[in-house]
Amino acid sequence: MRPTEINPADYEQQLAQKVNSVQQAFKTFSMPALEAFSSAPLNYRMRAEFRMWHDGDNLDHVMFDQSTKQKYAVNQFPPASIVINEVMMKLLSLVKKNEVLRRKLFQIDYLSTLTNEILVTLVYHKPLEDEWLKEAKALRALLRDEFKIDIIGRAKKQKVLLDKDYVIETLPVNDRLYTFKQIENSFTQPNAGVNSKMLEWALDVTQDCQGDLLELYCGAGNFSLPLAQNFRQVLATEISKSSVAAAQDNIRLNNIENVTILRMSSEEFVQALNNERSFRRLEGINLQDYDCQTVLVDPPRSGLDDDTLDMIKEYQNIVYISCNPETLNNNLAVLSETHNVVRFALFDQFPYTHHVESGVYLQKR
């Protein structure tokens, strides 16, 4: 099914199928009851990207059918936020009529927030010169009559800012609002509503944890900042420079004082923890000052490498957020040698697709 054809009437059925699929995938383990967290059935995605198709004077957003690989025009995109749908058609109508802006336009990316900020990236197969900047500023001025919008231009080895390259998301988590700087072309959770539920679940499962929290793959601090209230200190690692910079900004924006971000991979952190290698990035930080009894991991689809698996087995509590049931299954086969799964959750980040986000909370036996 094409994402443009989703039907809200089918939502509960597709969620039930996912619940059954996840339960079957983990039936070889002793798992607690699965907690399922639903999504809004429409307008749940905070970001979207489209290729552009030029046909004479016409210009369309297009996607490609996964079965036939044929392109099809996208006039409205029901999974995306309302503001993305509103902006994409208004912007397209203006760009179509502007030769400077439309020529060799290859792709448009949209990043929005729950408070209706939106950042639009126009991607080109041509160098962007002063004339493009002038026309892009005029386009932004027209769109700002209706929208809280910024525009970026990208081309090969080129990124042109009109103002800023980020949006500020305000995310409700229980009875508190968290502010997150989300940078263009960096990873963010696509489904803000489900992300809030995922953070509330993580807060709930760790509410009685003692000591400090270690988080690997922390991104811009999506988990680190809300979870800081449950721990004395939070020590978090991330390899991406832009994500680390955003995380530092987010710490300041939320006035949180007990989170420390380290720019290093999980593999490097294991080396540092085992005194196998020294890092200048750890200057002024003594890992022995932390009493990390809980670890949170949110790894890529490939899951955890063997060294990281061996390392986290030493922790009393493990929160594992997974975007790939297959690698979670493989990793659980190792972790279940020392830990019991006491909470198990499905987060429907990607409705109407086969993709599943899940969470497990494990405690050492």
Curated annotation (Swiss-Prot):
One GO process term, biological-process aspect: tRNA methylation
Keywords, alphabetical: Methyltransferase, S-adenosyl-L-methionine, Transferase, tRNA processing
Catalytic site: C323, E357
Catalytic activity as recorded in UniProt: uridine(54) in tRNA + S-adenosyl-L-methionine = 5-methyluridine(54) in tRNA + S-adenosyl-L-homocysteine + H(+); uridine(341) in tmRNA + S-adenosyl-L-methionine = 5-methyluridine(341) in tmRNA + S-adenosyl-L-homocysteine + H(+)
InterPro entries in the cross-refs: MeTrfase_TrmA_AS, MeTrfase_TrmA_CS, SAM-dependent_MTases_sf, TrmA_MeTrfase, U5_MeTrfase_fam
GO MF annotation list: rRNA binding; tRNA (uracil(54)-C5)-methyltransferase activity, S-adenosyl methionine-dependent; tRNA binding
Keyword Transferase: yes
Alphabetical list of SUPFAM superfamilies matching this protein: S-adenosyl-L-methionine-dependent methyltransferases
Binding site for S-adenosyl-L-methionine: Q189, Y217, N222, E238, D298
EC number: 2.1.1.-, 2.1.1.35
Described purpose of this protein according to its UniProt entry: Dual-specificity methyltransferase that catalyzes the formation of 5-methyluridine at position 54 (m5U54) in all tRNAs, and that of position 341 (m5U341) in tmRNA (transfer-mRNA).
Entry's family note: Belongs to the class I-like SAM-binding methyltransferase superfamily. RNA M5U methyltransferase family. TrmA subfamily.
Protein's recorded name: tRNA/tmRNA (uracil-C(5))-methyltransferase
